[in-house]
C-alpha cells in the first residue's frame, strides 16, 4: 500500500520537477500494477468481517491476517494516503485489527491495542494506538485513545516503544522519539483548540534531545 502511494508521488515528481515523461509513466505503471495485485490477491473473505486486507499473502491462497504496530501498516492506510477511513474494505480491516481475532491485539486494565512480534507478548505499541486515533472517524474514539496514551505514562512523561497494558511501568526502549513525535502530530491535528483535552499541568515536562 505504501508503495502505491510512494510510486504515485514519484510519478508526480518525475513529471512536475524533472519533466521526465518516460520515468513518470514507468512509475505510474508500476504503481498501477502493485495496486491491481493488492486488490486481486490481498483481499480475504473473513467471517464476521467480510473482505479485509491481509497483512501478507504467498500467491498460493494462503494469507496472514494480522498487522504490525509500526508505520506503514494496514491500520495506517488512510494516514499515509492509500485509502479513505470510510472505505468499506478498510473499515472491515480496521474492525478485525482492533479485535481479539487479531493475534497481535492485546487488552489490559490500562489500555488495549496492537503489539508486535518484535517486543514481549501482550505488550502494545503507542505508535499503533496513535494511528488508531489519527484514523478514527469519531471524536469519542479519538478521546478514548488519548486517554489510554496518557494513562500509559510510567512517570517520565514519555511514550515508549511498547508497554504492558496492565502495568505501564513495564516498557521497552526508554528513549524512543518516534511515538513522541507522532503523539504531537496527533494532538495538534486532531485536538487543536479543543478545551476538553485532558492534558493537565504540563509545566514540569522535560524535553531531551538524546
Where are these regions (language model features)?
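A short secondary-structure junction motif
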Residues: 13, 41, 45, 152-156
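Extended ligand-binding clefts on enzyme/binding-domain cores
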Residues: 1-5, 16-128
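The core hydrophobic/aromatic register in alpha-helical repeat solenoids, strongest
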Residues: 7-10
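C-terminal capping/lid segments that line or modulate ligand- or cofactor-binding pockets
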Residues: 64-84, 122-210
